[in-house]
């Protein structure tokens, strides 16, 4: 393509791990180990952030902070966040490979992008240790990006644009408007907006829907419709220029953005 130069994907819930399920059990188990219960819905709230800020956000929830204070006699502080994080990371690493299945359609879209001379980048809220468990399996299934930028590679994670700014030069792209960020989380969409890229939300395969593929397929049509509408509205409220069900639906959006850039439009 002449105008679109790069697509930057998130990982969990966008290209692997349908429903973004891997971190959820790890978060719940970790807090349970400290004698504080959290729900899956609570755990999902800050998804897309780096994992230590994610834990900090969970511990700042009034109900969780009160439960922590009841258990330990003080409000959660930095040392407590570190303690929870140190327990969480090995749990996430342990399950990551089990949730590295590439989401249907991703490999075909990656091939189509390469056929159009579009570079493929990725950013993630995962650490490099966690990604080491995911990348080989994804590559074997047909998804191997040109760039992977992880939590810890930049001064701040999402919603800051630092990971975008690191990715673009690695892809040889210097105009952010020529890139598309694809993400299933609100902070991931904000990352793209803050970085000056086009932003495409993924509603059904990711965190906003939060269900395994088989469970999604089993939903009654009316329930699927309202869940999809709610997920779409969340991502649009975060600033997404487009919202698709999954990456399998991406190529028509890429062509539309190509046409808009040709007309002189900007994100």
Curated annotation (Swiss-Prot):
Q: Which Gene3D superfamilies match?
A: HAD superfamily/HAD-like, Putative phosphatase, domain 2
- Positions binding Mg(2+) in this chain are 10, 12, 184
Task: Show the InterPro entries listed in the entry.
Answer: HAD-like_hydrolase_sf, HAD-like_sf, HAD_sf, PGP-like_dom2, Phosphonoacetald_hydro
Answer whether the UniProt record assigns the keyword Magnesium to this protein.
yes
Q: Which GO terms describe its biological process?
A: DNA repair; organic phosphonate catabolic process
Asked whether the keyword Phosphoprotein is assigned, the reply is: no
Instruction: Give the record's keywords alphabetically.
Output: Hydrolase, Magnesium, Metal-binding, Schiff base
CDD domains attached to this UniProt entry: HAD_PHN
Q: List the Pfam families.
A: Hydrolase (PF00702)
The entry lists its GO molecular-function terms as: magnesium ion binding; phosphoglycolate phosphatase activity; phosphonoacetaldehyde hydrolase activity
The record lists the catalysed reaction(s) as:
phosphonoacetaldehyde + H2O = acetaldehyde + phosphate + H(+)
Cofactor, how bound (note):
Binds 1 Mg(2+) ion per subunit.
- What's the EC number here? 3.11.1.1
| Record's subunit section | Homodimer.
* Protein family according to the UniProt entry: Belongs to the HAD-like hydrolase superfamily. PhnX family.
Q: What is this protein called?
A: Phosphonoacetaldehyde hydrolase
This protein's encoding gene = phnX
């Amino acid at each position: 393509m002449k105008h679109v130069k790069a697509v930057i994907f998130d990982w969990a819930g966008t290209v692997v791990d349908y429903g973004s399920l891997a971190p959820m059990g790890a978060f719940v188990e970790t807090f349970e180990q400290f004698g504080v219960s959290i729900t899956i819905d609570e755990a999902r709230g800050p998804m897309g952030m780096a994992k230590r800020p994610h834990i900090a956000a969970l511990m700042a929830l009034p109900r969780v902070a009160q439960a922590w204070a009841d258990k330990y006699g003080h409000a959660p502080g930095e040392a407590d966040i570190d303690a929870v994080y140190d327990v969480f990371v090995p749990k996430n690493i342990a399950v990551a490979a089990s949730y590295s299945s590439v989401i249907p359609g991703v490999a075909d879209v990656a091939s189509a992008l390469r056929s159009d001379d579009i570079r493929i980048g990725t950013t993630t809220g995962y650490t490099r240790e966690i990604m080491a468990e995911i990348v080989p399996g994804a590559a074997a299934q047909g998804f191997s990006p040109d760039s992977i930028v992880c939590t810890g590679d930049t001064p701040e994670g999402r919603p800051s644009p630092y990971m975008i700014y690191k990715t673009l030069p690695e892809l040889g792209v210097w105009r952010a408007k020529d890139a598309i960020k694809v993400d299933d989380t609100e902070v991931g969409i904000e990352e793209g907006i803050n970085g000056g890229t086009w932003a495409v939300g993924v509603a059904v395969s990711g965190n906003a829907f939060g269900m395994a593929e088989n469970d999604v397929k089993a939903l009654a049509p009316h329930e699927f419709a309202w869940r999809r509408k709610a997920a779409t509205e969340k991502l649009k409220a975060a600033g997404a220029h487009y919202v698709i069900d999954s990456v399998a639906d991406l190529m028509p959006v890429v062509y539309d953005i190509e046409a808009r850039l040709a007309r002189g439009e900007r994100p």
